Structures are given as structure tokens and as C-alpha cells.
Amino acid sequence: MPIGKLTLATLGCLLLWTATVAAGAAQKEDALKVGKKGEITLSQQAKVGNVVLQPGTYVVQHRVSRGDHFVRFLELKEVKYSTTEINDTYTEQDNAGEIKCRVEPATGRIQQTTVYTVTDGGAVRITKVAIKGENVVHVF
């Protein structure tokens, strides 16, 4: 094969390889990052975003998707069932809602999961959540 054709073939292969690498790099994979979680108990009905949470125990969990931050509220329900002479119970999680939030830096690592609320016209509204072990506060 003459040098000119060999050079042209080499350049063609190099161009094809470059296009393949560039196409692979352009396909960005979105990672769903799930942060720490904590458990809270609400003694009265509370609103967060446009979701109303009933009194009860919830697992709160932070997650990040495509750069947006969310807090998920999973209600813990005790379910009783009796298939034998012994009445057994187990805890079931029910997704009560997931609310978009923004994060603000905390003064340090959060020592205890805490929910901050305000009362608007007699209704309780959750304004922010701090989850044990994290170093940010989730603001609604």
C-alpha cells in the first residue's frame, strides 16, 4: 500500500476512534445519590411542600437526582397479622411524599435528626429538616 493511502487510512481510523470516544463521553450517566436517613415522630398533622403528613412515625431520607435535592418521607406503620395462634406484628413503610428542597451548610455534623416547624394560621408547616450524620440542612 502506498504511503499516501496508508496515511489516509490511518487518519480515517483515527477520526473514527475519536468520534467513538467523544460519543461515549457525551452520554452522561445520572447517578441517584441517596444520603443518610433519620426517624421522626409527628404528634400532629404537618404540611411540607404540598404534602400533608398525618401524625405518626416517619423515616426521612435525603437524595440527589440530576443536581436537585429531595427529602423523602416514609411513614412507618405497624401491621398486625395472625396466621397462627401467635399474633405477630411487623413494620411497613409507606411513601408519604417526596419534596424538593435546597441545602444549606450546617455549622458542623448534625448530632440528631431534627424537624423545624412554624405555625401558619393554626396549621403546622415543616420548614427544614436536619438529618443526623449530615453536614447540611434541607430547607423547603
Predicted regions and their residues:
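Bacterial N-terminal signal peptides
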Residues: 10-19
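Sec/Tat signal peptide C-region and signal peptidase I cleavage site
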Residues: 20-25
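Short acidic, Pro/Gly- and aromatic-enriched capping/linker segments at domain boundaries
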Residues: 27-47
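A short tyrosine-centered beta-strand micro-motif
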Residues: 56-61
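Mature extracytoplasmic domains of secretory-pathway proteins
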Residues: 62-95
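Bacterial N-terminal signal peptides that target proteins for export
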Residues: 1-11
